[in-house]
Amino acid sequence: MKILLAGASGAIGQTLIPLLIQQQHEVVGTFRNPAHAARVQSLGATPLVLDALDARAVTDRVAQIKPQAVINQLTAIPSRIDLRHFDRDFAPTNQLRTEGTRNLTTAAANAGVEKFIAQSFAGWPYAPRGITLKTEEDDLDPTPPPQLKPSLDALETLEHTVLRESRFTGIVLRYGPLYGPHTSVALGGNGLPDGSMIEDIRHHKIPLIGQGTGVWSFLHIHDAATATVAALNQAQRGIYNIVDDDPALVSEWLPYLAECVGAKPPMHLPNAIARMMVGEHVVALMNDIRGVSNEKAKRELAWTPKWASWRQGFREALG
């Protein structure tokens, strides 16, 4: 199968290309920065410099390539996110998820693409109520903190854009918070630095806010890639949560991660002080978000995460 992988130089893209090549797919990998060409080519894909925000260029290139499938992994997430200015740091990614996705879906539909897979997110967008794990049928948060609203709006726009197009099979993968190579939760090596979150934990910059009652559903970067391959091979139109099997309280995973990287336990910060220092949205991420179920993906995609628990993944697979 000929596949156009948009965002090939990103964390998931770099992990995904070799898996697609192993299955004998022909991959054209796009990226905006020409400096990424050698890396994408070394992984086995045909490199292509393409600005997803240039609608005419996207239309022309997709028509020339004539892929059977498009995989949209477009992001522009900075290597270090200032959570106090979450909306600012995610603005370029939000633009790619709205305008870039619109350009890609229009071009794909006009070019006869059969399947379109797009990256979304399951980490915090679900409504923070109830105690059961969130499924694909549950509502997203109708009243997110203001700092998170632009990103949630962009994710909803992306999902609607992909799923409403009738000329191809639209698939949305809601990945959990990622860890492992090329992510912010990664150990360095081979000339690469630690991920920014690991650096901050080592320097005691990430406190445990409040009681740490937020529930996170993590995902190793390798499992994000294998789930994407499974979706390419088997998925029907719809949304799939892609997370591990072990939802985790912040009060459990944050001290454990600190221990795994040889850092001191995180300090505690009361909610009231944290609201003043970093904002209500960070307090919500630490205390309010709910865990996510992967049962649909396991059942319908015949997919199982290799790193079924963040506990093993943090110990063995950060680098």
Task: State where each predicted segment sits.
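Mid/C-terminal beta-alpha module of Rossmann-like enzyme folds, strongest
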Residues: 2, 15-18, 225-281
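N-terminal Rossmann NAD(P)H-binding glycine-rich loop of SDR-like oxidoreductase domains
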Residues: 3-25
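NAD(P)H-binding glycine-rich loop region in Rossmannoid oxidoreductase-like domains
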Residues: 32-41, 45-103
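Conserved Rossmann-fold NAD(P)-dependent oxidoreductase catalytic core, especially the SDR/UDP-sugar
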Residues: 81, 85-146
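Conserved beta-loop-beta element that borders a ligand/cofactor-binding pocket
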Residues: 115, 120-121, 157-181
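Substrate-positioning beta->alpha
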Residues: 150-157, 183-198, 209-232, 238
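Amphipathic terminal alpha-helices
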Residues: 308-319
